[in-house]
Amino acid sequence: MEYVTLSNGVKMPKLGFGVFQIAKEDCERCVLDAIKIGYRHIDTAQSYFNEEEVGNAISKCGIPREELFITTKVWIDNYGYDKAKQSILKSMKKLKVEYIDLVLLHQPFSDYYGAYRALQELYGEGKIRAIGVSNFSPDRLADIAA
């Protein structure tokens, strides 16, 4: 398995299995099959509505948690400091994990500044191992980094 090292030193598998548009009734089986053939990076999102099924697969797969890399994304309806923080804690429960390896802000709309502050706080608490963004243009990324 090849890895990329993120800016904070966390190693992320280069190849991941994404669950976008996988039906709830198929998701758990698909994730279990992906893990069985060697995938260790599973990518989901709040807006995919299948975090719970991913969590079921994680808990049943028999692979130690530290060998898996789980990514999820906060949806814009959950932006703002309080809503983002609560949504991430809810995602952790659905995923049945004590921490999430990578949490991304899914889109550059609404109060992503507040959401980013929540991610930073949860990162500091060890509930998130890495923070990132998805679908952000360079100028929006520069705004957050400032």
Where are each of the predicted segments found?
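Generic structural signal for short, solvent-exposed loop/turn connectors between secondary structure elements
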Residues: 1, 26, 49-50, 62-63, ...
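N-terminal binding-site loop/beta-alpha segment at the start of enzyme catalytic domains
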Residues: 1-68
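Context-gated lysine
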Residues: 11-14, 24, 36, 60, ...
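Structural preference for beta-strand elements that scaffold enzyme active sites
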Residues: 12-16, 40-41, 67-73, 99-104, ...
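Active-site beta-loop-alpha junctions enriched in small/polar residues
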Residues: 20-22, 45-47, 73-77, 105-108, ...
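N-terminal, well-ordered alpha-helical segments
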Residues: 32, 52-56, 72, 86-89, ...
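Short active-site-adjacent helix-start/loop capping segments
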Residues: 51-52, 78-80
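Glycine/proline-rich, positively charged
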Residues: 79-146
